Amino acid sequence: MIRRPPRSTLSSSSAASDVYKRQEDNPEVIYAVYSSSDYSFHGIYKSIDGGDNWSLQSNSPNILGRDTDGTGTGGQSWYDLSLGVSNNDENHLFVGGINLWESTDGGANWTIEASSGNGNYAYMHVDQHCLEFHPITNVPYAGNDGGLYKYLDNLNNWIDISDGLEISQFYKLGLSESNASRLIAGAQDNGTEMLTNGVWDAVRGADGMECAIDPYDEDLLYSSSQYGGLRKSFNGGNNWDNIKPVSYDGAWVTPYKIHPNNNNMIVAGYDEVYLSLTSGAVWDSISYNVSGGQSVRTIALAPSNEDYIYAATYSRVKKPTNTGQSWTSIKPGLPNYNISDVTVSDNDPNWLWVTMSEYNASNKVFESSNGGATWTNITGANLPNLPVNCIVYQANANEDLYIGTDIGVYHKDNTMSDWAPYKNGLPNVVVNELEIHYPTNRIRAATFGRGVWDSPLNSSSTYTNYNIVNNLNIYPNPASNRLYVKLKSSDLVHFEIRSISGKIIKEGTLAYNNYIDVSRINSGTYIIKIRVGNSLYRQKISITQNSR
């Protein structure tokens, strides 16, 4: 057991975070790094008698701060603080905070070793969490928010050896309804990543947060950075426009949603709820003091009715009582715990569920069938006593629910009396968001530390395009006069042709093997939506007209 340096040994009683490391070749040698109450460098201490006595080695420069020259105040040792001691040289140390620092004289003097900036030091991702020397080779390794790094002595450099490790810390993800191989996800310290046909590409920097893909156009992307830096791309992530509705910050993960049946409608939560009916070009505040001074943490939209919007802070859940700025609290009846997520039935705007991110075994998931007037606790007895981070509703006959917890996914439907694990093959990992890809009947999970995972749904949805896609033929493409819609069955076909911005250009109903007259539609790229019963299919089409 290591005896910590007594407070009388420290230069101040305000020391905060700390980390200890014993030297392998001489276990009597122990180092301790302390941070101050503002998370700056408080000091490094050394013991040569197994922890009975300690001496201060140094308390400057500020090796836990952001500045690579050690000036400045503060740091973030509450999040990143690490210490490594060479196995065969007790005076060779590394300390990691935001950056990585090195000492070769037992902590008396320090030089910057690595950071993410440009300077006279090696490149390394910021936020250092662990440091270890290999027990045989004595090669140092560093683990940070960017992955795992190894020191190359012959090059005096650090290299990223994370390739192939599925360790991204994702907060949120967005799926493409029209392209099953595309998704976009926001990662801690690694920006916004986009997956297309099995290949990941970085499309934005900073800390990646909430993401979305337009349901009609896979190249129309939305992403956000920390505190609500909301942006939009029209060309698959090559360029981004700022569409943030306010100049000030929202929550760390600021919520926003695109309405599933109206891609022009976006709702975002900052201090208030903001609505855009122009895909983010123009915003209006639609609430007043809805957050009570807090930041809105989650937004839920009712697919069946655009007037139903639910917004929640950690301690409040509200919905609008009309299309104006009057909102009603629906928190009464819920326990006084942090709210993590809200989801709404696809068919009934008053049927919703709320989850709690608390360590309280009996208060995890709540259901309301009357718009929050009353609540039913559906936590059951099988859930682990860990935070529930997210919930998603599957529109089908069994009314499946899926929740993401700190150790994976759990599932319940209307035939089950309690929740059951739904994580075969999934590591025990924090699941921050779940989204359903209806065209392929699959569910995808954004995890904090193990990347993005994919699984078949428990039961098929009636809302899937694969019932018709193999029997459907839309031609010619491009078209000029007639666009033929051929279906092997004799079912009635409902169609919509929309502009890329979502405006309905033409809609109607077709009988078996018929065509749409597009002769009066201007040349351009459009989205055609075909609905047959409960099945839906979307496709890009081009219309080319001769000069007239």
Language-model-detected regions and their locations in the chain:
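Entry beta-strands of beta-propeller and related beta-repeat scaffolds
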Residues: 26-32, 89-94, 137-141, 179-183, ...
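Surface-exposed coil/turn segments at beta-strand junctions on protein surfaces, enriched
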Residues: 25, 88, 261, 304, ...
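Short, small-residue-biased leader/transition segments that mark boundaries at the very start
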Residues: 4-19
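C-terminal outer-membrane/trafficking sorting elements
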Residues: 467-475, 479-548
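Asp-box/BNR beta-propeller loop motif
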Residues: 14, 37-66, 99-124, 145-168, ...
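Short coil-to-beta transitions that initiate beta-strands within beta-rich domains
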Residues: 14-17, 66-86, 116-134, 161-178, ...
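Active-site lining segments of carbohydrate-active enzymes
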Residues: 35, 50, 60-92, 98
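A recurrent domain-boundary module in secreted/ectodomain proteins
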Residues: 432-462
